[in-house]
């Protein structure tokens, strides 16, 4: 059972611009409806560095001992930069929550990864395995959202509103920093 007032780190990547090989990664530390901090890093578009960058970003922050949940809007950020949820949980000793409006279709993401690998001559097998492993967790539908996590359903019900709001704010910051003004939905 999670304690009341748990700190969530919401992760959002900036927009993908064809002229750039990287984008901003924003982390918002959120607790009880309050933004307590903002973290940032640069990640490769369609790269394989998102998990390591998130781990490094958290470990060097003053919030490292307080963050108990890392939330993302999907398992792939900055295009096809796939998160290794298990590695993040082990290295940071946190829970991970993937929250989406629509139920993800594993087949579509796997097909996109394979096409990307074939087109660029890149080995994407480790990313494909990360997607398959994450999807073993299944999805819970709560409050109109799909959540994927190792947390039990009662804990998910307690935090999904905070997780969504923190992701919304992280998304606004990432877009605002990149474009000079925020726009769009998560």
Show the residue positions of the predicted features.
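Two-metal-ion RNase H-like nuclease active-site motif
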Residues: 1-18
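Conserved active-site and cofactor/substrate-binding residues in soluble primary-metabolism enzymes
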Residues: 3, 22, 45, 49-53, ...
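Short glycine-rich or small-residue beta-strand-to-loop segments that form or flank ligand, phosphate
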Residues: 11-12, 68-74, 97-100
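Gly/Ser/Thr-rich loops at beta-strand to alpha-helix junctions
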Residues: 14-18, 74-83, 102-105
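A glycine-rich, hydrophobic loop/mini-helix early in the fold
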Residues: 21-78
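Charge-biased, low-complexity intrinsically disordered regions
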Residues: 42-43, 55-60, 108-111, 115-118, ...
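Long, charge-dense
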Residues: 85-144
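Charge-patterned, long linear interaction tracts outside catalytic cores
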Residues: 148-186
């Amino acid at each position: 059972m999670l304690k009341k007032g748990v700190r969530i780190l919401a992760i959002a990547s900036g927009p993908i611009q064809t002229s750039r090989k990287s984008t901003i990664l924003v982390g918002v530390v959120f607790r009880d409806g309050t933004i307590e901090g903002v973290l940032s890093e640069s990640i490769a578009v369609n790269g394989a560095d998102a998990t390591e960058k998130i781990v490094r970003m958290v470990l060097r922050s003053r919030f490292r001992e307080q963050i108990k949940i890392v939330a993302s809007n999907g398992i792939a950020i900055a295009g096809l930069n796939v998160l290794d949820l298990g590695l993040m949980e082990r290295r940071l000793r946190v829970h991970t929550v993937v929250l989406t409006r629509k139920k993800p279709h594993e087949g579509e993401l796997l097909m996109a990864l394979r096409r990307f690998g074939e087109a660029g001559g890149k080995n994407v097998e480790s990313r494909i395995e990360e997607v398959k492993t994450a999807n073993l967790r299944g999805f819970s539908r709560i409050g109109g959202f799909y959540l994927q996590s190792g947390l039990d359903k009662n804990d998910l019900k307690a935090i999904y509103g905070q997780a969504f709001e923190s992701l919304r704010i992280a998304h606004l910051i990432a877009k605002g920093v990149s474009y000079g003004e925020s726009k769009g939905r998560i």
